[in-house]
């Protein structure tokens, strides 16, 4: 399909970067979203480490990087030390992105205190995001806000608020079907409201009954119909990025505030490579019908 590229969070295949690249190439994929490699998160790499270690392996495999799967913004809103650390990490991540010829960095809008009204923290969220955006503007990189669970921008109304208020060419939306399902939202309404800001799509599905992730197209994310709308009717071009969450993987615990086993209660495939391949083929089957 012209101008549609399938990428994915390859650390769901294996913690080994070589195994990630091997599986990706066997599937015929040419891109990954770089979240972690060899059990090390992308935000913990130096520019030199990426240049001398990861980049040569990417080039040898013929694999490009669609986005940096960073943890930026995945700290508590009142964690000032954590925020300052992430500002420094974002500077490095922007330099890494340029080295990898990658213009997108995935990020979040801060964890809210449990039991508190997110509206009480809106001003603090906006202020801190403006600082992140200023760094991105300096490096000409685009920050993509993912509608992650339990952050300020986890529901539609607050996602729209962020996009409209910040109104920056360097702050856009990475649309995640499953997260909206798990937050009780209608993905079709979310798509329509956020469409002017969406530059990237995560392929992850879920059901609302137990909030479990399921193979794409089999849950309540309305992935087939919304991808058809996006690509065929609206002319979306760019990346569709696999994030299966069908098998427990090493880096998951570092991404979540709860026990990883509460996120993926049971492995739906025998290993990460099999689950990743299943998600890839399910997406290809959806696209083949367009």
Question: What residue ranges belong to the model's regions?
Answer:
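Glycine-rich, proline-tolerant flexible connector loops at the mouths of alpha/beta enzymes
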Residues: 33-55, 59, 110-116, 211
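A short acidic, helix-capping loop that chelates divalent metal ions and anchors anionic groups
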Residues: 38-43, 74-79, 113-118, 182-183, ...
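Active-site acidic/histidine proton-transfer and metal-coordination neighborhood
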Residues: 16-22, 59-60, 64, 76-173, ...
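Active-site beta-loop-alpha junctions enriched in small/polar residues
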Residues: 9-13, 35-39, 70-73, 110-112, ...
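Histidine-acidic metal/acid-base catalytic patches
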Residues: 1-7, 14-28, 101, 156-175, ...
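Mobile, glycine- and charge-enriched loop segments
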Residues: 2-10, 59, 64
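Conserved beta-strand positions in the central sheet of alpha/beta enzyme cores
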Residues: 33, 67-69, 106, 144, ...
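N-terminal-biased segments
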Residues: 6-18, 44-54, 85-90
């Amino acid at each position: 399909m012209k101008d549609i590229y399938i990428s994915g969070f390859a650390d769901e295949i294996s913690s080994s970067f070589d195994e990630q690249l091997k599986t990706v190439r066997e599937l015929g994929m040419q891109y990954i979203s770089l979240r972690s490699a060899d059990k090390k998160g992308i935000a913990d790499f130096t520019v030199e480490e990426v240049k001398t270690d990861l980049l040569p392996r990417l080039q040898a495999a013929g694999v490009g990087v669609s986005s940096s799967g960073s943890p930026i913004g995945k700290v508590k809103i009142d964690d000032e030390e954590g925020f300052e650390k992430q500002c420094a990490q974002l500077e490095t991540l922007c330099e890494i992105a340029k080295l990898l010829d990658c213009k997108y960095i995935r990020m979040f809008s801060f964890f809210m205190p449990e039991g508190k009204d997110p509206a009480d923290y809106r001003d603090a969220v906006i202020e801190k995001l403006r600082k992140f955006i200023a760094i991105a503007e300096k490096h000409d990189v685009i920050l993509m806000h993912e509608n992650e669970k339990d952050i300020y921008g986890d529901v539609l109304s607050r996602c729209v608020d962020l996009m409209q208020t910040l109104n920056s060419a360097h702050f856009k939306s990475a649309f995640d079907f499953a997260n909206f399902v798990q937050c009780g939202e209608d993905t079709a309404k979310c798509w329509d409201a956020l469409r002017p800001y969406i530059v990237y799509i995560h392929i992850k599905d879920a059901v609302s009954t137990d909030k479990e992730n399921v193979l794409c197209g089999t849950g309540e994310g309305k992935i087939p119909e919304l991808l058809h709308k996006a690509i065929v009717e609206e002319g979306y071009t760019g990346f569709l990025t696999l994030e299966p969450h069908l098998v427990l993987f090493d880096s998951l615990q570092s991404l979540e505030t709860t026990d990883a086993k509460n996120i993926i209660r049971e492995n739906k495939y025998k290993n990460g490579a099999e689950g990743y391949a299943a998600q890839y083929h399910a997406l290809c089957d959806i696209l083949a019908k367009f």
